[in-house]
Curated annotation (Swiss-Prot):
The active site is at residue 60. This is Protein-L-isoaspartate O-methyltransferase. Its EC number is 2.1.1.77. GO terms for cellular component: cytoplasm. One of its GO terms (molecular function) is protein-L-isoaspartate (D-aspartate) O-methyltransferase activity. Belongs to the methyltransferase superfamily. L-isoaspartyl/D-aspartyl protein methyltransferase family.
Amino acid sequence: MTSQRTRDRLIQRLYEEGLSNAHVLEVIRRTPRHLFVDEALAHRAYEDTALPIGHNQTISQPFMVARMSELLLADGPLDKVLEIGTGSGYQTAVLAQLVERVFSVERIQALQDRAKERLVELKLRNVVFRWGDGWEGWPALAPYNGIIVTAAAADVPQALLDQLAPGGRLVIPVGAGEVQQLMLIIREENGFSRHLLDTVRFVPLLNGPVI
């Protein structure tokens, strides 16, 4: 269930679906997704589907992890990325292998504690975690070259726009219903450009930390 052939099949499927960043695909290939799901679901870890991780949250499908990572890195390597929604830590682990530093915010402490353990196990040491409200971002360490949000916001949080560096890219699902639009926002010299992309399904971005 975790064989190299199984992972290769997943990467081939992602490539056929239009993903083309070789570095992103290689990181997806070598990141052990089965470590980020419950043991009972490990046999489904390399399916291209979202899976439950408890607390009414999910681990994103590999396609969406790769897609959002590609969008974030489209202008080249980044040195400082803010992730809103640590969740299982899978997207965090992928980002940690693609950028210099990751700052990850999660409102559910139990999820973040487990994610920390997984990243330690994988010897990924360039991630700093914060337990808190994702709507607020992490202003103390701003600005960020890239911001990625792994839950859907009804509107784009102003705090995240404020924390985006000039030329920086924000990738976020936007919408209040079960179906949302993936949006790419770029901070330009005189404001922000917004680009509506894929139709997506994400859990909602909620307020307030939870133990």
